[in-house]
Amino acid sequence: MSITKNAPREGAEEVAATALGVAAARAAETRRQRPLIVDPFAQLFVDAAGQDLWSMVASGAAHDELASADPALAAVMQTSLGHIASRTKFFDEFVLAAADAGIRQVVSLGAGLDTRAWRLSWPDAVTVYELEQPNVLEFKLATLRDNGATPAANYVDVPVDLHRCWPRSLCLAGFDPAAPTAWLVEGLLPFLSVAAQDLLFGDVHKLSVPGSWLAAEALSSEFLKPTTVARQRARIRRMRVTAATLAGLSNVTELWDLAEGRSDVADWLRGRGWHASVLTAERLLARYHRSAPVELGDATPPSLYVTARLSAESSLDA
């Protein structure tokens, strides 16, 4: 049975708005004349959710309405959509490079409605493990199944709360801690506490052998500044009142943990034998020709993109 926006899937209202928002952004990118990424499944999630807000974002109608009333605010929205597209492309390229280098197990922590296991061209014998809240995975897999989608890699879903003992669930699902792994941490860290972030990377490190790769969207010091958060919240409020199609837009910053003392991800990894490099979101968007207008430079999210590889001389007990 095909799912349409006129028949929302049972339980769709429980799927995190953040996951649906990112799917809508990928659907919008897929519609572009020269898309950075093509995700033929993103629109399926938008339709299955049956929420006009995300349908309007995916179709471009929300942006067009905003542009007619406030072009500068529309440019902010377009930068946000461009950031999600660039982020998706970054992780796509990373994970395919890891697979081409011989890594045969991929773990996505907080996978949301990502569809890499379905839409990327994988080498033989790659297994993709996705860890996410049970309701999100149930919605995703049911929507894909009802639309005849099949994974392009060996796929294993691991329904789990990442605040709990997820390593045990991952290993019980077939993960091999003795084999090199490509780890993906995309769009997750703002929702974790300072302690939970350290625990997450501690568990990743314990489960990694030399030759493992990791990519993470990390938070710069600017990301957590009260002025940065206040500016983003103000823009979301303006979008709500400027465009009727965006009236239901949730303020994702209210879900972030803004406590001080968060570890620098790259430094944390380097201290445990990983060779890490960092790319700012501004440079990432420039790489893919999606930079914000000069006069709206602060519209680019102050994220950091960390890539790392675990060296042979690393102590796994560090």
Curated annotation (Swiss-Prot):
Query: What enzyme category does the UniProt record give?
Result: transferase
InterPro entries on file: Ppm1/Ppm2/Tcmp, SAM-dependent_MTases_sf, SAM_mthyl_Trfase_ML2640-like
Please cite one Gene Ontology biological process associated with this protein: methylation
The task this protein performs is described as:
Exhibits S-adenosyl-L-methionine-dependent methyltransferase activity.
Query: What EC number(s) are associated with this protein in UniProt?
Result: 2.1.1.-
**Similarity section:** Belongs to the UPF0677 family.
Instruction: Report keywords, A-Z.
Output: Methyltransferase, S-adenosyl-L-methionine, Transferase
Q: Which SUPFAM superfamilies is this protein grouped with?
A: S-adenosyl-L-methionine-dependent methyltransferases
One MF term in the entry's GO annotations: methyltransferase activity
**What name does this protein carry?**
Putative S-adenosyl-L-methionine-dependent methyltransferase MMAR_1595
